[in-house]
């Protein structure tokens, strides 16, 4: 057999056993839809030295007569990040530019609502990249391009390129071209491969195109090398040089001695369904085969951390353990903070997970025990945690950090062949330990201890064109091998984006300690055009958009951009402003209202009996629909007041709500949450017996697995059955449904507040801040969660920051009205906690304003208009069109484009029944969304020692949303 064929077979065998397809998935209306399909795919591969640039250009066709928005999820391998993004604008591809992630999100969403063409590529949880595309025209197409650089691994004596493909549907137009620049040896492919390389000048190229083609086989080729000689690529940059060096250090075989008492931490959260558990079990099989006799403790991790059992394995028989693992039920969110390995008896641990801790930071170690990266010990227990990942979507950085902090192994089953896996599990791992200090070399990455499996590569910056670098390798902390690398800019490969490979390596290292390195990660992403957690790539349609938002456009637009930037007036610049001045004005209005003496007024002249009868009519108890049109927004308040409740209709379609809660003391006002019947089809199968109903839930979940409403309703069912454990497990599954979905997390946070799970609510609200830092509602929700958990000072400071932070003018505009609500809540905290530090708070805002009744709502969907209505015992209704009642009731401003909040307050309540309604008025969302979730808080004796609160979450039905009218009665209470 020819030598190159041996090398290629080795490469192909490894690829066949180690890869998963990186198939982009397009979602429309939050789900994979046949409405839009991949019409054409062009793939361009360019290899320079040991670095490959891969670009996907995808054209999507809209089959419908509707304009749609799509979200494309693009998973990338461990250590690889997107560095190219382009979108078709007026028939021509336009390159994206890097922007801070929060700003990019805000700009994208604002422009989308003007119905023009922005594009956005952002990194979401794990190593996943999401691009948002709008519009996809009716019966039309949109084209996007995404690219990334990666270093090629060495297998045998060859560099191996592999692009996994497993497309399920045929593509109308498919093409692929691969180019090896300055190639000295012809790339090798197997006979079944459709790529055939030919010489083209100093390069080698291969290309093919097909019609109605279904790409099912990986694209692979190999480049023979001399691995004894380090490969070096260099790129000049402002008098310095970026370099990437790759070598193949010789390894000694050292047998790994596994402990005879191992703990298995098995991620049993909902996302566990996406892991390749067959591969996970193969890992355990390998260890058992080598160790034969051991004791295994099995721990299950989802929203809780529980011990499932202890298994004594003798002579390699682990049938009972295997059966237990194969029967695990995957449900709930993932809470890494619940794991405390130091208190467990096991000597070392195997963690099988995707690294996506949806309910806590991805860290097993409490703050008082945490050690700084890169030192590897959590404490003196010397318990290694080996992190094993088999999921295609994973947070590699989180798992690498846990392994590094505990001197454990990080094992990515998606990148290891069976042979490599066996070697990894049965031998000690060689580590790169650093470099010998050299004066003219700096910024070398990795700079920390790094496992070495085959080849190892390092990147850095040198101030001279020619120097030497010594790499240190060993086992544990002992240096046992030195590798000399010669850097010579005249001899090294000088093509390719070496600077981006360097930046990518630095980003990967800094990302492991993300919280400490946020600012530097942002700077790196912006300078090198790389998508990070803090930076995105954005495409705008017009030069005016780049000017308005102060974003430097791609090269072809920069001359006009800079010329016009000099000419623009101050009015053209998008400004930022705080809410403080508005809050002071609202505080004055509130104080004037609160100080007003409201007396019961009697009509001067007799009132006709027919009018009295009309006023005394009760609003129907379940669901009321007020028949008014959108034009009524423009009618005067007096006219609206006369028309309110003039026509009443009934609607049967309703959605289940939270459990009724009653105030215990008879002397206090009684708040009754209106019980709504369970009309969802899946609820009809439940019988009221928790264990049996849980089995029904699991069976039904197969059909509704990606439907948030299903978990929302099911959780409440079990909560009503007083099975809070199952309720929380089901509820927290919502966090696993979609990466970085703030609307889902807001929904989850509302329900957690209702269930008094305040610590978990704090984490959920804090994640929303990370994703939506541009919105005041994010900080308000977080502040109120802090207060509920007893952290009053932190809550006060955070709530005040809602008013003092600066916001873009469009955000400030659609949040107008939140100031009054925040002022009310600030004064409540101060009134009930007199020892808090408040010297930094504007004095004009402070005025105790206790009231007998306060009702407040907010909702989870942006660009949505939901209204609060409160009817008093006199049958007088306070709502946006009739903001003050005769007995002193007052409602805040109508928020029509945000998340709320809206509040009703009554200083002195009269005796009688009060009824609370909500009305879905409409939305301006570009893409269809699930039902809006409303959180309603009802207070009696607000800001008083006798204060009582009830919380209820309500989901509006699709039918009610579609009609854009109707009142839903959610509560009533006697005062």
Pin down the residues of each PLM region.
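Short beta-strand-loop
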Residues: 296-324, 342, 359-365, 396-402
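VWA/integrin I-like adhesion module and closely mimicked acidic/polar interface patches used
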Residues: 353-405, 411, 422-424
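N-terminal, polar/Ser/Thr-rich
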Residues: 20-49
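Von Willebrand factor
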Residues: 257-312, 339-353, 387-390, 394
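Generic helix N-cap/helix-start motif at coil->alpha-helix transitions
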Residues: 673-676, 704-711, 724, 738-745, ...
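Intrinsic-disorder/low-complexity signal
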Residues: 829-975
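An acidic, Ser/Thr-enriched
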Residues: 84-90, 95-124, 128, 132-137, ...
């Amino acid at each position: 057999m020819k030598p190159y064929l041996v090398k290629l077979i080795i490469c192909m065998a490894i690829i066949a056993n180690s890869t998963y397809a990186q198939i982009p998935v397009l979602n429309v209306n939050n789900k994979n839809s046949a409405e839009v399909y991949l019409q054409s795919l062009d793939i361009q591969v360019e290899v320079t030295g040991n670095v490959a640039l891969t670009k996907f250009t995808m054209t999507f066709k809209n089959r419908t007569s509707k304009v749609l928005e799509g979200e494309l999820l693009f998973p990338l391998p461990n250590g690889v990040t997107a560095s190219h993004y382009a979108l078709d604008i007026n028939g021509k591809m336009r390159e994206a530019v890097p922007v801070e992630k929060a700003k990019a999100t805000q700009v994208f969403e604002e422009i989308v609502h003007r119905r023009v063409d922005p594009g956005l590529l952002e990194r979401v949880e794990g190593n996943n990249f999401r691009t948002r595309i709008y519009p996809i025209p009716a019966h039309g197409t949109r084209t996007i391009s995404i690219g990334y650089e990666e270093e090629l691994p060495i297998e045998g004596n060859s560099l191996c390129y592999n692009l996994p493909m497993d497309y399920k549907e045929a593509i109308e137009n498919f093409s692929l071209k691969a180019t090896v620049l300055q190639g000295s040896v012809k790339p090798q492919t197997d006979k079944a491969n459709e790529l055939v390389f030919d010489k083209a000048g100093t390069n080698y190229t291969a290309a093919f195109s097909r019609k109605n083609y279904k790409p099912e086989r990986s694209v692979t080729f190999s480049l023979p090398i001399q691995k004894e000689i380090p490969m070096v690529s260099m790129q000049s940059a402002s008098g310095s040089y970026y370099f990437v060096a790759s070598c193949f250090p010789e390894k000694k075989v050292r047998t790994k001695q596994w402990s005879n008492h191992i703990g298995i931490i098995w991620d049993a959260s909902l996302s566990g369904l996406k892991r390749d558990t067959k591969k996970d079990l193969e890992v355990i099989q390998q260890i058992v085969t080598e160790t034969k006799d051991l004791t295994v403790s099995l721990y299950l991790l989802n929203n809780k951390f529980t011990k499932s059992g202890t298994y004594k394995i003798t002579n390699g028989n682990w049938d009972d353990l295997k059966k237990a693992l194969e029967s695990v039920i995957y449900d709930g969110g993932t809470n890494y903070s619940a794991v405390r390995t130091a208190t467990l008896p096991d000597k070392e641990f195997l963690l099988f997970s995707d690294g996506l801790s949806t309910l806590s930071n991805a860290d097993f170690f409490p703050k008082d025990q945490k050690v700084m990266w890169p030192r590897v010990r959590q404490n003196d227990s010397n318990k290694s945690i080996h992190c094993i990942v088999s999921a295609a979507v994973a947070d590699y950085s989180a798992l690498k950090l846990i392994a590094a902090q505990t001197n454990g192994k990080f094992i990515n089953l998606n990148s290891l062949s069976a042979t490599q896996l066996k070697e990894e599990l049965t031998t000690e791992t060689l580590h790169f330990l650093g470099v010998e200090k050299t004066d003219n070399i700096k910024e070398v990455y990795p700079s920390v201890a790094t496992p070495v499996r085959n080849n190892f590569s390092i990147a850095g910056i040198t101030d001279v064109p020619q120097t030497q670098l010594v790499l240190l390798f060993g086992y544990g902390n002992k240096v046992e091998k030195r590798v000399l690398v010669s850097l010579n800019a005249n001899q090294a490969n000088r093509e390719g984006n070496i600077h981006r490979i360097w930046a990518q390596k630095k980003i990967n290292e800094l990302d492991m300690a993300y919280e400490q390195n946020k600012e530097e990660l942002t700077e790196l992403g912006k300078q090198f055009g790389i998508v990070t957690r803090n930076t995105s790539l954005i495409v705008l349609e017009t030069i005016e958009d780049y000017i308005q938002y102060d974003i430097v456009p791609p090269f072809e637009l920069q001359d006009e951009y800079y010329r016009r930037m000099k000419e623009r007036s101050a009015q053209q610049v998008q400004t930022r402003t705080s809410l403080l001045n508005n809050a002071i004005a609202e505080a004055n209005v509130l104080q004037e209202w609160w100080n007003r003496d409201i007396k019961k007024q009697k009509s001067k002249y007799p009132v006709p009996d027919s009018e009295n009868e009309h006023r005394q009519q009760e609003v129907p108890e379940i669901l009321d629909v007020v028949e008014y049109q959108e034009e009524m927004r423009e009618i005067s308040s007096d006219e609206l007041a006369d028309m309110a409740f003039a026509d009443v209709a009934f609607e049967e379609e309703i959605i289940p709500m939270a459990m009724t809660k009653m105030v215990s003391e008879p002397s206090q006002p009684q708040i009754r949450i209106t019980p709504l019947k369970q009309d969802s089809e899946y609820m009809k199968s439940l019988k009221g017996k928790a264990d049996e109903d849980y089995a029904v839930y699991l069976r039904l979940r197969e059909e509704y697995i990606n439907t948030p409403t299903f978990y929302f309703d099911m959780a409440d069912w079990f909560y009503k059955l007083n099975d809070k454990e199952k309720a929380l497990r089901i509820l927290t599954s919502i966090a696993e449904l979609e990466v970085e979905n703030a609307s889902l997390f807001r929904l989850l946070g509302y329900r957690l507040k209702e269930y008094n799970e305040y610590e978990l609510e704090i984490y959920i609200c804090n994640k929303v801040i990370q994703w939506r830092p541009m919105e005041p509602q994010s900080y308000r929700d977080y502040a109120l969660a802090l207060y509920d958990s007893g952290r009053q000072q932190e809550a006060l400071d955070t709530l005040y920051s809602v008013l003092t932070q600066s916001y873009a003018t469009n955000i400030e505009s659609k949040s107008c009205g939140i100031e009054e609500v925040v002022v009310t809540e600030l004064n409540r905290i101060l009134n009930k906690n007199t020892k808090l530090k408040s010297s930094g708070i504007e004095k004009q805002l402070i005025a105790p304003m206790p009231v007998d009744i306060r009702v407040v709502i907010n909702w989870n969907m942006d660009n949505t208009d939901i209204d609060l209505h409160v009817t008093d015992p006199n049958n007088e209704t306070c709502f946006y069109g009739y903001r003050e009642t005769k007995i002193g009731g007052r409602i805040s401003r109508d928020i029509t484009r945000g998340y709320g909040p809206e509040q009703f307050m009554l200083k002195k309540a009269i005796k009688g029944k009060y009824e609370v309604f909500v009305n879905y008025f409409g939305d301006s969302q570009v893409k269809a969304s699930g039902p809006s979730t409303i959180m309603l808080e009802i207070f009696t004796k607000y800001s008083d020692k006798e204060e009582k609160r009830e919380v209820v979450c309500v989901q509006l039905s699709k039918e009610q949303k579609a009609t854009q009218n109707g009142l839903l009665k959610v509560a009533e209470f006697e005062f």
